[in-house]
UniProtKB/Swiss-Prot annotation:
Main location class: plastid
Organism encoding this protein: Oryza sativa subsp. japonica (Rice)
BP GO terms, sorted: protein transport by the Tat complex
Compartment list: Plastid, Chloroplast thylakoid membrane
Transit sequence range: 1-66
The protein's name: Sec-independent protein translocase protein TATA, chloroplastic
One family name in Pfam for this protein: TatA_B_E
Region of interest called Disordered, as start-end residue ranges on this chain: 1-20, 130-170
Organismal lineage: Eukaryota, Viridiplantae, Streptophyta, Embryophyta, Tracheophyta
Function description: Part of the twin-arginine translocation (Tat) system that transports large folded proteins containing a characteristic twin-arginine motif in their signal peptide across the thylakoid membrane. Involved in delta pH-dependent protein transport required for chloroplast development, especially thylakoid membrane formation. TATC and TATB mediate precursor recognition, whereas TATA facilitates translocation.
Keyword Repressor among record annotations: no
Entry keywords, A to Z: Chloroplast, Membrane, Plastid, Protein transport, Thylakoid, Transit peptide, Translocation, Transmembrane, Transmembrane helix, Transport
Stromal side: 105-170
Length: 170
């Protein structure tokens, strides 16, 4: 997997470190080259470094979203897999190598087991939480609200009120 060379063009402005292409066709060709670099699975950081600016980053991100929006395309390629927290295969290999150097080969299996147990407990807690939410939504959604007590008067209260008022007036 090789990288495409970045061409520079002579420029009259000295304020910019990047030179502008002499015509619009060359600009479209450069944008297509950046899109190929992004579609090849390079990270956006690397493609913005190759193109030399934030404008290239926007083009690379747009090209990546267009390339990944197809029905069967899943960002393939050996270097294109962003597996965990945006880390690719090379980053994970470096992290594993540093961990092997720091902890040593005897402690690595123990550390791996403890990390696995922690991840398993988090997954179990998430499943329990999800089942509780489903259970609550199933219980509360189908039943009508409980009936409220309504005061039904049979006329007995009115007779008592009349009797008490007549006693007071006497």
């Amino acid at each position: 997997m090789g990288m495409a060379p970045v061409a520079t063009y002579p420029s009259s402005s000295s304020s910019s470190t990047l030179a502008r292409p002499p015509c619009a066709a060359a600009g479209r060709a450069a944008a297509a080259g950046r899109a190929r670099v992004a579609a090849a699975g390079m990270s956006s950081r690397a493609s913005s470094f190759v193109t030399g600016g934030a404008g290239g980053l926007a083009v690379a991100v747009a090209a990546r979203t267009r390339a990944g929006s197809g029905a069967g395309s899943r960002g393939g390629g050996a270097m294109g897999c962003k597996c965990l927290f945006g880390l690719g295969v090379p980053e994970l290999v470096v992290i594993a190598g540093v961990a092997a150097l720091v902890f040593g080969p005897k402690q690595l299996p123990e550390i791996g087991r403890s990390i696995g147990k922690t991840v398993k407990s988090f997954q179990q807690a998430a499943k329990e939480f999800e089942t509780e939410l489903k259970k609550e939504s199933d219980d509360g959604g189908d039943q009508p609200p409980p009936p409220t007590e309504t005061a039904v008067s049979d006329g007995g209260e009115e007779k008592e009120l009349e009797a008490s008022s007549s006693k007071e007036s006497t």
